[in-house]
Amino acid sequence: MAGNLFGKMAADTLGLSDIGKIISPKDFDKVDGDDYIMNEDGEKIYFVIKSKSDEYVFTNRGLLHVDGDSAVSKKRVVKRHDFYYEKVHSVTLETAGTIDLDIEIKFSFGNNSFSIDVDKKQLEQLKNLYKALVEIGRIQGKNSTSIEDGMNSLKMANEAISRSSLQGNASEIVKELKNYNFKRMQNIRNEYNNKDFGYVFE
């Protein structure tokens, strides 16, 4: 958390305070991150936290982090973290103490960890983001288990076939088996590796 009231006053005096604000949906088109949304792929913004130097834009496809050097610099680095490639985990929400001005949400996308301070007056909105990220992480975990189970079942079936006597053209049977395995693995990944989590936010 960014600190207590006196620490915040000092930080504000030095221009260092960077408490994020949750942006209203009607203003999503005004944030920098909106320029990098893949509209052609059906990407849609569901949640935005904006601070003096950074934007955290949560979409149905993942997180767009518009990373700024400082509040006074116009230099920005846009980083994309897709649900399809990175699992959400370690989600925590820290509420404010008596003299705190901010609340804090922490989470990770794969190996990338984030910690965002937010105005404590927006706790209820931040709870919604917390719950959405936790649910997405749970779904990803279940899907990962389903993919692993599907692959193991396919492996056991192939081993059973390899131990049996093949009738007919062996090379043709092996070729057909490889094609089946490839298609089956694709189907398993497509079924259990979600790209779109918009329904969780809605």
What is each model feature region?
Residues 2-8, 22-23, 28, 73-202:
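Acidic, Ser/Thr- and proline-rich intrinsically disordered linker/docking segments
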Residues 2-75, 163, 170, 174, ...:
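N-terminal recruitment modules of adaptor/scaffold proteins
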